[in-house]
Regions:
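Alpha-helix-loop-beta-strand connector modules within alpha/beta enzyme cores
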Residues: 60-81, 114-126, 186-197, 281-283
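N-terminal amphipathic alpha-helix/helix-capping segment at the start of soluble metabolic enzymes
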Residues: 1-27, 120, 283
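Hydrophobic faces of well-ordered beta-strands that scaffold small-molecule active sites
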Residues: 22-28, 53-55, 77-81, 99-101, ...
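Hydrophobic or amphipathic alpha-helical targeting/insertion segments
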Residues: 86-127
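Catalytic alpha/beta core domains of metabolic enzymes, predominantly
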Residues: 130-131, 139-286
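Glycine-rich, proline-tolerant flexible connector loops at the mouths of alpha/beta enzymes
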Residues: 29, 35, 46-69, 100-108, ...
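Glycine-enriched alpha-helix->loop->beta-strand junction motifs that scaffold or abut catalytic
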Residues: 72-75, 93-99, 120-123, 190-196, ...
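Active-site mouth loops of central-metabolism enzymes
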Residues: 19-37, 56, 75-83, 139-152, ...
Length: 349
């Protein structure tokens, strides 16, 4: 699909924009004062495939976390700053790779100037973060609620604060807890500027509902070519955010080094425990980086017939499964040996 044309913003070693792969982000959730826990979580996120990590900096004491993580983990860091412009300056001076602020609530004009100049000197981009829970009072009064138009007006106002200072090294995130509002706001904003967009649904919910809402909003926008970096926000282990984001990109054909895993919902023709077989196989294959399609099908109707385009798959029979490749039968395998058989055949591809 054709992506919306944007300029490039460099965040540490990761380039964000339409000329580059979509970057996956997450956020540390350990207490800022627990440096070891944050380092451990940052390492785990990088191993899971996270490209950029955001961390909250609620106090001056917490600024030390930036250098501690950068010494231990080679990954771009984004400082999440609220209200106190001095924290943004301190984070930039500490070597953070991007600063997330709302220029409209960071302080006076002089304080905004100080943040912008510090970021300009160090070539650090600013991420303007607008969400439905923190709109300016005057905008809420104008629209009555956080509509898509209200969110975009807020974002454009923040942009003006930066561009009036001739600062264009920024990107924008516009998020709502409502999936439709998120889609409408980003679609509207994308028509107005060429700056890169960070996509996400704020307060999306637990792993189950959060993934559904995020997939609807983020996936819908990506299908329209909108979006340059994403976060699947979840009330869950941040590792799940990263895995879900990569699975979403793979499902849309935007990542070519991941297994595309498909399985049928089963029916009365199925004579094997396909639920267990599919879960076990998916988990075992999730870390393999190969551009192939693997199908776990319940009977001969769905596979290898309907799944003939799969590079590899199994179709359930009477207490056993037929392993096939590109629609051609290979051999039969017992249910408890399906995962191992798939792993062995994948190694041959």
């Amino acid at each position: 699909m054709q992506r919306r044309n944007t300029r490039t913003v460099q965040v540490g070693s990761i380039a964000i924009g339409s000329a580059h792969p979509i970057a996956v982000q997450s956020m540390l959730c350990a207490a800022p004062g627990d440096i070891n826990a944050n380092i451990e979580q940052a390492r785990a996120l990088k191993t899971a495939g996270c490209d950029i990590i955001r961390l909250a900096i609620p106090s001056m004491e917490d600024v030390r976390l930036i250098s501690a993580i950068k010494e231990a983990v080679d990954i771009p860091l984004v400082a999440d700053i609220q209200f106190d412009y001095r924290l943004a300056i301190a984070a930039a001076q500490a070597g953070v790779d991007k600063v997330r602020i709302n220029p409209g609530n960071i302080g006076s004009a002089d304080q905004v100037n100080a943040v912008v100049e510090t970021c300009r000197e160090r070539e650090i981009p600013i991420r303007i973060g607008v969400n439905s829970g923190s709109l300016e009072k005057e905008i809420l009064q104008k629209y009555g609620r956080p509509t898509a138009e209200a969110l975009v007006e807020s974002a454009m106002g923040h942009i003006r604060l930066l561009e009036e200072r001739h600062f264009t090294n920024y990107l924008v995130a516009i998020k709502s807890s409502d999936a439709i509002t998120t889609v409408e706001a980003n679609r509207l904003f994308a028509q107005k500027t060429d700056c890169p967009l960070h996509l996400g649904v704020t307060e999306a919910g637990t792993a189950h509902m959060g993934i559904i809402k995020s997939s609807a909003a983020i996936g819908g926008l990506l299908c329209e070519g909108i979006g340059d970096t994403i976060r699947v926000s979840l009330t869950a282990d941040p590792i799940q955010e990263v895995l879900a984001a990569h699975d979403l990109l793979a499902a849309l054909g935007m990542e070519s080094d991941r297994i595309r895993f498909v399985s049928c919902p089963t029916c009365g023709r199925c004579r094997v425990d396909l639920f267990r077989i599919a879960e076990e196989a998916e988990q075992a294959l999730s870390g393999i980086h190969k551009n192939i399609k693997v199908a776990i099908m319940g009977c001969a109707v769905n596979g290898p017939g309907e799944a003939a385009d799969a590079d590899l798959g199994v179709a359930g029979g009477n207490g056993e499964l037929l392993l096939f490749a590109k629609g051609k039968p290979l051999y039969k395998v017992a249910p408890e040996k399906v995962t191992q058989a798939l792993l062995e055949e994948i190694d041959k591809l």
